[in-house]
Curated annotation (Swiss-Prot):
This is Small ribosomal subunit protein uS11. It comes from the Bacteria. NCBIfam families: PRK05309.1, uS11_bact. PANTHER family: 40S RIBOSOMAL PROTEIN S14/30S RIBOSOMAL PROTEIN S11 (PTHR11759). The keyword RNA-binding applies. The lineage of its organism: Bacteria, Bacillati, Bacillota, Bacilli, Bacillales. Belongs to the universal ribosomal protein uS11 family. SUPFAM superfamilies: Translational machinery components. Part of the 30S ribosomal subunit. Interacts with proteins S7 and S18. Binds to IF-3. Keywords: Ribonucleoprotein, Ribosomal protein, RNA-binding, rRNA-binding. One of its GO terms (cellular component) is cytosolic small ribosomal subunit. PROSITE patterns: RIBOSOMAL_S11.
Amino acid sequence: MARKQVSRKRRVKKNIENGVAHIRSTFNNTIVTITDEFGNALSWSSAGALGFKGSKKSTPFAAQMASETASKSAMEHGLKTVEVTVKGPGPGRESAIRALQSAGLEVTAIRDVTPVPHNGCRPPKRRRV
């Protein structure tokens, strides 16, 4: 039985000048998503997707690498300026923002949108090492 030829869709290059970089920095990983102003994703990257495993995912260097790869692929769509929204308490917050700037994107605003509970769920118990 012959296999059907499937035509793959080529990635369309959009011409978007300014967007939003969403940095989600948890204790275990850092995820960087770059969207246009309406929230449609242009590119994304994470420390785990780059091959960092285990505790190496939660390092500032892994966040820097994730931010660089996401910004490079977003700049192929013509992106020049970004607003940055940072969510979470992780160690990769500052290094991810610095990597966006060093990759050639102009950061216009930095916004911290970390969710703060008004005494909601009980937090996880303290670690005893």
